[in-house]
Amino acid sequence: MGVTFDKCETRPANIDAILNGLDRYNPETTTVFQDYVAQQCEDRTFDCYANLALLKLYQFNPHLLQAETVTNVLVKALTVFPSPAFSLCLALLPAHTQPFQASDAEAQAAAQTSDFVESIQKLARLSTLLESAQYTQFWSTLNSDDLYADLVADVAGFEELVRIRIAVEVGKTFREIPAEVLEQWLDLRSREALEKFVAEVCSWEVDKSGANTVIKVPTNKENEARSEVKSERVGVDMFGRVIRRGSSRLHERIDKRYPHRTQPFSF
């Protein structure tokens, strides 16, 4: 059974107390949540519910917003794809930061001159690539600009966490995958690094028996092909209701078309 959205096994007791009380709306707790985000970046955990509470406080108190903390929250959300975490966080940010064109002229001007807005929109691009399984394009985009490196620098093990999430999705979909393809999807620059990752992290098999190296994924409930036959019993009485309903409608149409007939039609 999955963990409910508002729960986090690694959440400290003081954070849990704030989230379950009125203090979650107290601006003075902003610094507590900010420190908690920094902790998540260091210990590779993710507490979506607490991070959303912080972004909500920023929404009510814009003067308290810390751009670096916001981008760290979004980067952490990337490490738990596929999930609604990134979209939920993005929805709580100011309108001019959103990855679509603003209608207000002042908002457009702010968007064009803000490094913060550029950072948000770059992270939104990464999220789109991950959620649409464009993994090779994700890595090439991530490596294309030094700003991306700066954005993910505070999140310990970012690349490793993303690789693990990609591997999880591959394991749900494939029984076999060419090593060359998986290399690109995981952005592992050598065959040795790939073989080490799939063996130690994924416990998958590397098959070199053929002309091309293939990674074999063990059967699981997601990637196993299953034939499923469903049968339904349809009683005669069910057909009777359908026939009576159709007959009734047919009579209504005939009455409308031939209102002056004296003899009934027989069927």
Curated annotation (Swiss-Prot):
Ranges annotated as spanning the membrane: none
Domain (PCI) ranges: 46-233
Compartments, as annotated in UniProt: Cytoplasm
InterPro entries tied to this protein: ARM-type_fold (IPR016024), CSN8_PSD8_EIF3K (IPR033464), eIF3k (IPR009374), PCI_dom (IPR000717), Transl_init_fac_sub12_N_euk (IPR016020), WH-like_DNA-bd_sf (IPR036388), WH_DNA-bd_sf (IPR036390)
Annotated GO biological process: formation of cytoplasmic translation initiation complex; regulation of translational initiation
Pfam entry (one): CSN8_PSD8_EIF3K
MF terms in GO: ribosome binding; RNA binding; translation initiation factor activity
Main location: cytoplasm
Keyword terms of this UniProt record: Cytoplasm, Initiation factor, Protein biosynthesis
Gene Ontology CC terms, in alphabetical order: eukaryotic 43S preinitiation complex; eukaryotic 48S preinitiation complex; eukaryotic translation initiation factor 3 complex
Protein family (similarity comment): Belongs to the eIF-3 subunit K family.
HAMAP family named in the record: eIF3k (MF_03010)
Protein function: Component of the eukaryotic translation initiation factor 3 (eIF-3) complex, which is involved in protein synthesis of a specialized repertoire of mRNAs and, together with other initiation factors, stimulates binding of mRNA and methionyl-tRNAi to the 40S ribosome. The eIF-3 complex specifically targets and initiates translation of a subset of mRNAs involved in cell proliferation.
Subunit structure: Component of the eukaryotic translation initiation factor 3 (eIF-3) complex.
Identification of the protein by name: Eukaryotic translation initiation factor 3 subunit K
The organism of origin for this protein: Aspergillus niger (strain ATCC MYA-4892 / CBS 513.88 / FGSC A1513)
Phylogenetic lineage: Eukaryota, Fungi, Dikarya, Ascomycota, Pezizomycotina
